[in-house]
Amino acid sequence: MALRMWASSAANALGVSCAPKSHLLPALSLSRCFSTVLDGLKYASSHEWVKHGGSVATIGITDHAQGHLGDVVFAELPEGGAVSAGKPFASVESVKATSDVNSPISGEIVEVNTKLSDSPGLLNSSPYEEGWMVKVKPSNPAELESLMGSKEYTKFCEEEDAH
């Protein structure tokens, strides 16, 4: 039992997760720090992702972000309204800290993931699927072009973690 506790503490300190992510295998890349980065998404330097499809964009925090936060115990989400690129729209509380979540794009919120109220841990276990935060109708789709692709974001995370 002591060995299991030591291994768990070491994994937490190193930011290593053993949570199964095999369902993500077809379109992912792994950075040196073992964060999952999906192809086909756009990424902000503040560690949020955007999946744009049709007239709606889905927004959440990245695997890299949740790994640095630790176990998320509470998520405060907006009830609706507008979001502005680079401005906070939500906050998440983990065992380590409370952090603002910035919107990578501007627009009108059309849906909020209410599952996160009862299950904030979805931000840890499924940040790109069940742990999405809001869906937004973008007001300025050109903002998506200023965000990073998967390769750029992976490199960004590696450089950030090296410092």
Swiss-Prot record:
<comment type="similarity">
    <text>Belongs to the GcvH family.</text>
</comment>
<dbReference type="InterPro" id="IPR011053">
    <property type="entry name" value="Single_hybrid_motif"/>
</dbReference>
<protein>
    <recommendedName>
        <fullName>Glycine cleavage system H protein, mitochondrial</fullName>
    </recommendedName>
</protein>
<dbReference type="InterPro" id="IPR000089">
    <property type="entry name" value="Biotin_lipoyl"/>
</dbReference>
<dbReference type="InterPro" id="IPR017453">
    <property type="entry name" value="GCV_H_sub"/>
</dbReference>
<keyword id="KW-0450">Lipoyl</keyword>
<comment type="subunit">
    <text>The glycine cleavage system is composed of four proteins: P, T, L and H.</text>
</comment>
<dbReference type="InterPro" id="IPR003016">
    <property type="entry name" value="2-oxoA_DH_lipoyl-BS"/>
</dbReference>
<dbReference type="InterPro" id="IPR002930">
    <property type="entry name" value="GCV_H"/>
</dbReference>
<keyword id="KW-0809">Transit peptide</keyword>
<dbReference type="InterPro" id="IPR033753">
    <property type="entry name" value="GCV_H/Fam206"/>
</dbReference>
<comment type="function">
    <text>The glycine cleavage system catalyzes the degradation of glycine. The H protein shuttles the methylamine group of glycine from the P protein to the T protein.</text>
</comment>
<dbReference type="GO" id="GO:0005739">
    <property type="term" value="C:mitochondrion"/>
</dbReference>
<feature type="transit peptide" description="Mitochondrion">
    <location>
        <begin position="1"/>
        <end position="34"/>
    </location>
</feature>
<dbReference type="GO" id="GO:0019464">
    <property type="term" value="P:glycine decarboxylation via glycine cleavage system"/>
</dbReference>
<keyword id="KW-0496">Mitochondrion</keyword>
<feature type="modified residue" description="N6-lipoyllysine">
    <location>
        <position position="96"/>
    </location>
</feature>
<dbReference type="Pfam" id="PF01597">
    <property type="entry name" value="GCV_H"/>
</dbReference>
<feature type="domain" description="Lipoyl-binding">
    <location>
        <begin position="56"/>
        <end position="137"/>
    </location>
</feature>
<dbReference type="GO" id="GO:0005960">
    <property type="term" value="C:glycine cleavage complex"/>
</dbReference>
